[in-house]
Amino acid sequence: MAKPIRVLLYYKYVPIENAEQFAADHLAFCKSIGLKGRILVADEGINGTVSGEYETTQKYMDYVHSLPGMEDLWFKIDEEEEQAFKKMFVRYKKEIVHLGLEDNNFDSDINPLETTGAYLSPKEFKDALLDEDTVVLDTRNDYEYDLGHFRGAIRPDIRNFRELPQWVRDHKEEFMDKRVVVYCTGGVRCEKFSGWLVREGYKDVGQLHGGIVTYGKDPEVQGELWDGKLYVFDERIAVDVNHVDPIVVGKDWFDGTPCERYVNCGNPFCNRRILTSEENEDKYLRGCSHECRVHPRNRYVSENDLSQEEVVERLAAIGESLDVTPA
C-alpha cells in the first residue's frame, strides 16, 4: 500500500528570467495548493525539496513541467508516512548551491550547462568504487559524511560546500593525476563542483548522475557499498540507501558508540550537528563542548526549563562545573 505523503527532490540548471519575481510567483502557487518545503531560485536555476499528499505533489510536478525550460525536469520521489516539512519557503539566492567561487577569489563561477563532469550511472559509479585507481570524493559536509558515505570515499574536512575548492587545492598532489569521481545527495552540488574540477585541470572527472538518492533506488545496485544512512535536509534527517547489507557507521559524539540520531548543539552560536543518543543528549545538556554546555543561551536548558541547581548537578555528574573553563 502506498504511503500518503510524497517527498520530491529536484533541481535544474536553467536560465530563469526575472528570477526574483519567479520566486515570488512560485511561492504563491505552492501555498495555493498546500505544498510544504524549501526551494531556492537563482538566475542559474532552481533547487528544491517539497512534500505533500499525492494529488498536491502531482499538481506541483505538472505545474513545474509547464514552465519554460523545465519540461524535462527530473523529480526524485520518496513515499513517506508524514510530511517532511512544516512550512513552505521559496527564496531567491545568488546561486542554487553556494560554492562561493567568486566570494573566495576562485575566479568566476561555474556554469554546469557549459562545463561539468561525465555522468555516471549507478552501475558505472559502483564500478568506480571498486576500482583502486579511481579517487571517490564526497562533496558533502563533514556531518553528512559521518552519518553515511560510500565505502572508501574520501572525507574532506569541511563544514560547508564553499570550503571544498580550497580543500581540493590543498590536497591537489594526492589525486591530480588520477581519475576523480564525485557524489552528493541529489546531484546538484556535483554538477557545479565537477565542472570546477575540469576547469582546474583534472583530466578524467565523473559524477554520480542523480546522486545518492538515485543510487539507493536503482534496482541493479540497490544501494550496495553505501555504509550508514543518508543525511537529508528536512524533518526526516536520515533515510536508508543500502538495501543489500546495511551497517551503521555513525558514532556518538560523546562516547563513540554506534549512533544515527542527529541534533544541533544547544549553543545557538555553535549549532554544530552532532550524533548522539537521547541519554547522552540529556547527560551533556546537548552541548558539544564544555563551553557550549555552560553557555547562557543553551537551548537545551531553556527548552527543558532546567534550574541552575539542576544544571550544576548534571555538570558535576560528568566532572564539570559552571566555570567557562572546565577543571
Curated annotation (Swiss-Prot):
Q: What is the lineage of its organism?
A: Bacteria, Bacillati, Bacillota, Bacilli, Lactobacillales
Q: What does this protein do?
A: Catalyzes oxygen-dependent 5-hydroxyuridine (ho5U) modification at position 34 in tRNAs.
Entry-linked PROSITE patterns? RHODANESE_3 (PS50206)
Signal peptide feature range:
none
Q: Identify the residues that the record assigns to the Rhodanese domain, covering every copy.
A: 130-224
Which transformation does this protein catalyse, written as a reaction?
uridine(34) in tRNA + AH2 + O2 = 5-hydroxyuridine(34) in tRNA + A + H2O
Give the originating organism: Streptococcus thermophilus (strain ATCC BAA-250 / LMG 18311)
Q: What is this protein called?
A: tRNA uridine(34) hydroxylase
Q: Tell me the keywords, alphabetical order.
A: Oxidoreductase, tRNA processing
What are the recorded GO MF terms, alphabetically? oxidoreductase activity, acting on paired donors, with incorporation or reduction of molecular oxygen
| PANTHER family assigned to the protein according to its UniProt record, in alphabetical order | RHODANESE-LIKE DOMAIN-CONTAINING PROTEIN 7-RELATED, THIOSULFATE SULFURTRANSFERASE/RHODANESE-LIKE DOMAIN-CONTAINING PROTEIN 2
Family of the protein in this entry: Belongs to the TrhO family.
